[in-house]
Amino acid sequence: GKMTYRTHPHNGDKVSILGYGWMRLPRMKNPDNPNEEIINQEEVNRLCNKAFEYGVNYFDTSPAYCQGKSEESLGIALEQSGRSRDSYYIATKLSNFSPTQWSLEAGQQMFENSLKYLKTDYIDYLLLHSIGGGGLDNLRKRYLDNGLLAWLMEQRAAGRIRNLGFSFHGDVK
């Protein structure tokens, strides 16, 4: 079959209508600790390559997925694919859910770690993760009062974030 793509009306990105979510990945027993399961990176790499073969070019991850290992796994899979960075889109999130992560410095570190783990110098789509959690008060604490949103806007202006948005889980109240 042939993949269908949609062109983003504001930035011209030609994105596959099927994206690959990196929230749940194949697992295996850890050879060093049989009581622990780890990501089966070999299988993940195979699935990533298969997704590329079918025309998928949009990959969604988060620092919170797979016990914090999702971004690193995606970075490895994309690197081993041999594809050029401009041939796919990475969406990740600023997943600063815990009050211990609400400082400007913690948010900056989370973003810098995402770049490192994903083996890239820019993020195509960065989402403020689940902004509905805790209502407007937590939104202010996570992104506004600490200056993090302003800093992220600076990163966008510098080209380190191509598109900045949010994800929301909750009701309209």
Over which residues does each language-model region extend?
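Glycine/proline-rich, positively charged
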Residues: 29-31, 36, 101-173
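Active-site beta-loop-alpha junctions enriched in small/polar residues
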Residues: 23-25, 62-64, 93-97, 128-131, ...
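Structural motif corresponding to the early beta-alpha repeats
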Residues: 81-104, 129-132
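Compositionally biased, intrinsically disordered low-complexity regions enriched in proline and serine
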Residues: 6, 21, 90, 123-126, ...
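N-terminal binding-site loop/beta-alpha segment at the start of enzyme catalytic domains
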Residues: 1-88, 150-151, 157
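Residue-level signal for alpha-helical context at structural boundaries
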Residues: 77, 91-92, 144, 170
